[in-house]
């Protein structure tokens, strides 16, 4: 092995997160890793309490459910992150777009009487 291919004590490799120290063979590292996990069961596996996949916290809702909220319409955390909206019977998908010349969002296909009832201006817009 060439001396230049072996990292020295002052060199850090990008793929190894371990701090520099005395080199150990893989056979010497296995008992040390097993002892750091705690007691080993008779089957040779770590006890269930030390399983790292079971340590993940459960995904919760981003906002708490308040009075008047319907649990049936509450979105799962996985579906909240998806960019595409899902239309149901109670919450139809309504496309939003920017008004030309301003920064407000407009709803497409809103009937004019609903627009006027919400305080919209009855004058025609210049296009």
UniProtKB/Swiss-Prot annotation:
Signal peptide: none
Biased composition (Low complexity): 24-39
Transmembrane segments annotated in the record for this chain: none
Domain of life of the native organism: Eukaryota
Annotated disulfide bonds: none
Region (Disordered): 1-96
Xref: Pfam families: UPF0731 (PF14982)
InterPro entries, A to Z: FAM229
Recorded family membership: Belongs to the FAM229 family.
Official protein name in the record: Protein FAM229A
Organism for this UniProt entry: Homo sapiens (Human)
Gene this protein is translated from: FAM229A
